[in-house]
Amino acid sequence: ITELVDEAERKVFQIADQGTRGSGPLRISDFLARAVDRIDILFHSDQVITGLSTAYKDLDEMTSGLQPADLVIVAGRPSMGKTTFAMNIAEHAAIQGDKPVLIFSMEMPGQALAMRMMSSLGRIDQHKIRTGKLADEDWPRVTSAVSMLSEAKMFIDDTPALSPGEVRARARRVTKEQGALGLIVIDY
């Protein structure tokens, strides 16, 4: 029955998309007026970060923040901190930016991500969190991190091996419930 519901939802979204798929290639002149309008808005703004702040000052200065509809790919060798980097940005977007954030974690269970975020926000060594060997002074920081995360509009889907269509359908469901998402992270 789940497959049937997913297929029906996919078909409904497919029908809805047919009216919004655009008109195909257009001349650049068709985009110039909107581009100039955007530049004018930015010119009159006192904001240095025009997108979503990443919490990484140098990165924000180079990119002006993550811009709507940007696709950002973080690449690196195994165990080089890609997940930690992405989760730090997600934490910042959800907590400091007060934006809904959706995380698809196809390799790591949601509980493990939550523990990493508690470690990060509480500034507690991950080894202590993983082993449960916390000192008395760590517990208030754990409580503070849990409080911040529980207030955040952060959603984790740790279903392994989702297809692009499934990711899209699930993102649309969360968008329908929460409004526009500030960030979608796919950790694969």
Describe the function of each predicted region:
Residues I1-S45, I49, A69, A75, ...:
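Short, small/acidic-rich helices and loops at N termini and domain boundaries
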Residues S53-K57, V167-R168:
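Short gly/ser/thr-rich secondary-structure transition/capping motifs
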Residues E61, T84, H92-A180:
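Cytosolic-facing regulatory segments adjacent to core modules
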Residues L181-Y188:
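Helical hairpin unit composed of two closely spaced alpha helices linked by a short loop
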Residues Y56-G65:
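Pre-Walker A adenine-sensing motif
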Residues T54, P78, T83-T84:
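Ser/Thr-centric signal marking residues that sit
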Residues G65-I73, I186:
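Catalytic-site beta-strand/loop segments enriched in glycine and acidic/polar residues
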Residues I89:
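N-terminal cationic and glycine-rich segments that engage phosphates or anionic surfaces
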